[in-house]
Design a protein with these regions (language model features):
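Extracellular/periplasmic envelope-modification machinery, especially enzymes
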Residues: 1-191
Length: 191
């Protein structure tokens, strides 16, 4: 019958192809190539390059900054052999995304910089309470003095943060942030 022919010629082959496609998707296409050492090494290199920024040892993103962190030589990138970096990258975890690109620029331009990122804490020189989650506030406050010391030791300050997150918490964020940048500028810093 026509129904049997349709089933045998179309439905069964389409179903078999769908099952094979789903199986290939389920095993992520590994199949025989998983036995290849070249494939495994390429996959490991790819995974290493696509790790989150905070997993790289030269990205100094912390949940709480300590005195040791602001002295950590792994946090200084760019041109080697410069005793005291005059530039600092300061911000929350969003700033960590720029470490690699600023490192490349610094090497080419011949300067070094320190990077200091404090997860979920805005780059402010004042109390961040209105702009952070209550769970993060103790870490933000405990880190503030160390971060201030590192920021004030620099001549040039690059600031990055997840601005929209802090603005969602309070419409006063920009006023407080601009007061911080003005304070830094008044202290002779380039922001």
């Amino acid at each position: 019958t026509a129904k049997t022919v349709f089933t045998v010629q179309y439905i069964l082959p389409a179903g078999a192809i769908a099952v094979l496609a789903l199986a290939a998707m389920y095993i992520d296409g590994y199949g025989l190539r998983w036995q290849s050492l070249e494939y495994k090494s390429s996959l490991a290199a790819f995974r290493d390059q696509t790790r989150p920024a905070y997993l790289f040892d030269y990205v100094c993103q912390r949940q709480r900054v300590s005195a040791a962190d602001i002295q950590n030589e792994h946090c200084v990138l760019g041109e080697k052999g410069i005793a005291r970096p005059k530039v600092i990258l300061w911000g929350d975890s969003n700033a960590a995304h720029y470490v690699g690109v600023i490192d490349a620029i610094a090497r080419e331009a011949g300067f070094s910089f320190r990077n200091m990122e404090l997860g979920s804490c805005p780059p402010l020189l004042t109390d961040p309470e209105s702009f952070v989650n209550a769970k993060r506030l103790p870490d933000c406050l405990a880190s503030a003095g160390f971060i201030r010391e590192a920021v004030m030791a620099a001549d040039i300050i690059i600031i990055s943060a997840s601005w929209s997150d802090y603005l969602r918490r309070s419409d006063k964020f920009l006023d407080v942030f601009f007061a911080t940048t003005q304070s830094l500028s008044d202290a002779g810093k380039q922001v």
